[in-house]
A protein has these predicted regions:
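Canonical tetratricopeptide repeat
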Residues: 53, 87, 117-124, 155, ...
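Short coil turns that delineate tetratricopeptide repeat
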Residues: 45, 79, 113, 147, ...
Length: 440
């Protein structure tokens, strides 16, 4: 009897010891001591008790290639283990080998068709490969099984967004899918952010505000949702709210190009030019090697023209012009901006300003530029050219704008129009010339 008891104890001891070791390894991993199981567990093919622990520890230490070998050794023992297939898929995803991850999750999904995690990871991996048609089909297959799945509609929206890169009309289907996902789960941050982005892209800014504000009642920390919320306020020209939201994003650690750019635009809209200049300069530094952003340069130049950086403002606007394709509408916009920058830069070369204004007139046909040109010539005491451009300006002013008139069309007492100023300047120049040279 004693002999049998001793033999039973001897057989039971290894099992007890293994259980103790497993618990010890798990405790070490719970304490983030991944090196301990990696060092102590000797890789042995088919050791199903310890191999998963070592594989998970290797993955946690970003030693994915070694972890792959461990999971693969287990798969050789049992190719129908869905859990091992999923772990193998996760390793492949971590290594950005998404094609292999798709294969692993597809096999796991065949073994457990109702497993939502396997289905989600299969779709995520498919989307990461850029195979949007297959992703769309997989999402539709999911929704055939579960038409109420918010996640299924969300992935369908992502698939259609990918297809829209080649066929823009697919964006409508993306919107429909995200809208369906939102109706089923209005608190999914990714869905809300994507739906709001589509609203913003379609200039439906109030709708973007609505969906993001509802989400923010339960979570104010989601970066993607807050970005779309802030952008919507900025595009609606609610610049104060835009500044508030973008500053909150910066406080959360978001100092991306987009956040700094739109924060600068919002400050510019509030006429806080120093803050606009500061944030737009920060945004520009984030793109040193990329092609310059013309819109960024335009607003940066305009902001600088209102601070002590007028010279830099002129340079930024010139850079924007040099980078722009010569389409009339864009060039008019930029040359108007350059004229404004030069007008505020009092130390700038007056003849450079004159050439810029002449170029601007050739694009926008704003005859008031002739008055500004005349003023510059007058300051340089180039009276012949000054008179020429004053007269050129006066010849183009409509009769109803030659005098300062009120709403009823009557002359305004104490007000002088630019036309009258030009008329007076010509008279003063000629009188001065007469007294100095005897020439009228």
């Amino acid at each position: 009897m004693m002999k049998r008891w001793v033999i039973s104890l001897l057989f039971a001891y290894p099992m007890w010891a293994n259980a103790q070791s497993v618990e010890e390894y798990r405790q070490a991993m719970d304490a983030f001591d991944y090196e301990m199981p990696i060092e102590r567990i000797v890789p042995e093919k088919g050791d199903s008790m310890f191999t998963p622990l070592r594989a998970k520890a290797l993955k946690a230490m970003n030693r994915h290639s070694e972890a792959l070998k461990e999971w693969d050794s287990l798969l050789q023992s049992d190719s129908t283990d869905a859990k091992v297939l999923a772990e193998l898929g996760e390793c492949y995803r971590s290594m950005n080998r998404n094609d292999q991850a798709v294969i692993c999750y597809r096999k796991a999904l065949k073994l457990q068709p109702e497993n939502k995690f396997f289905r989600q990871q299969h779709l995520r991996s498919l989307l990461a490969t850029g195979n949007y048609e297959a992703s769309r089909d997989a999402a539709h297959a999911w929704l055939e099984q579960d038409s109420l799945s918010a996640a299924g509609y969300k992935f369908l929206g992502e698939a259609y967004q990918g297809l829209a890169l080649e066929a823009p009309e697919m964006l409508l289907y993306a919107f429909t899918a995200y809208n369906a996902a939102y109706r089923r789960d209005s608190l999914d941050g990714h869905t809300v952010a994507q739906l709001a982005a589509l609203f913003n892209d379609n200039k439906q800014w109030s709708e973007a505000v609505d969906v993001t504000e509802i989400y923010r009642r339960s979570d104010k920390m989601n970066i993607d949702v807050n970005r779309q919320n802030a952008k919507a306020y900025c595009m609606m020209k609610n610049y104060a709210k835009g500044v508030d939201r973008y500053e909150a994003l910066k406080a959360l650690g978001d100092k991306s190009f987009t956040t700094l750019y739109y924060l600068g635009i919002s400050y510019y809209g509030m006429e806080w030019y120093h803050a606009a200049e500061r944030n737009l300069l920060e945004a520009q530094k984030l793109r040193p090697s990329a092609p310059a952003d013309v819109n960024l340069l335009y607003y940066l130049a305009k902001a600088c023209s209102h601070t002590s950086s007028q010279q830099e403002g002129v340079a930024f606007m010139k850079e924007a012009i040099n980078l722009t394709e010569p389409t009339d509408s864009v060039m008019v916009h930029l040359y108007d901006g350059l004229v404004d920058c030069y007008s505020r830069w009092h130390k700038g070369d007056p003849y450079e300003k004159i050439e810029v204004m002449k170029k601007a007139y050739s694009l926008n046909k704003k005859y008031t530029l002739f008055f500004k040109i005349a003023e510059l010539y007058n300051k340089q005491k180039d009276y012949a050219n000054a008179i020429h451009y004053y007269e050129k300006y006066m010849s183009m002013v409509p009769k109803d704008k030659q005098m300062a008139l009120d709403e009823t069309g009557k002359p305004m007492v104490g007000w002088t129009s630019l036309y009258q100023i030009a008329e007076r300047k010509i008279k003063e120049i000629r009188e001065e010339s007469f007294f100095q040279h005897g020439i009228k």
